[in-house]
């Protein structure tokens, strides 16, 4: 499980270094293989260990090709999906297309989201987390049925 937000740099070749606290698990459990794609609702990337992506892929496969909304999700998530391998220095290369989508520059945020990571442009992350915290303390959260039974 991946958790926490880490500020990391992206080098001139478009590589990011996975934090050392995750590397052993990622190599042992997932052989350092990933799939990176775009988030369809946010200006960030989603980085899945390959095995976790294969689960998502099966869900995408189950969607209807004849329903326009479902087809859009398939097209975007599968169309941008790019395999990445972690090198011996713990780095992965993000394609120019993916970097452009998320407007990634030098400083980025790698955010653990249980079975995957989100990759954000630093300023976009700060903006998003501020919005999330504001909504989290509002009445809007009280109306979500799934959250009513969540005990933290």
From Swiss-Prot:
Membrane spanning stretches: none
BP-aspect Gene Ontology terms: negative regulation of DNA-templated transcription initiation
Subcellular location: Cytoplasm, Nucleoid
Signal sequence range: none
GO cellular component annotations of the record: cytoplasm; nucleoid
Protein keywords: Cytoplasm, DNA-binding, Repeat, Transcription, Transcription regulation
Entry-linked Pfam families: MraZ
Highest taxon above the source species: Bacteria
GO molecular function (one): DNA-binding transcription factor activity
Database matches in CDD domains: MraZ_C, MraZ_N
NCBIfam families: division/cell wall cluster transcriptional repressor MraZ (TIGR00242)
Subunit (UniProt): Forms oligomers.
Family assignment from sequence similarity: Belongs to the MraZ family.
Identification of the protein by name: Transcriptional regulator MraZ
Organism: Glaesserella parasuis serovar 5 (strain SH0165)
Underlying gene: mraZ
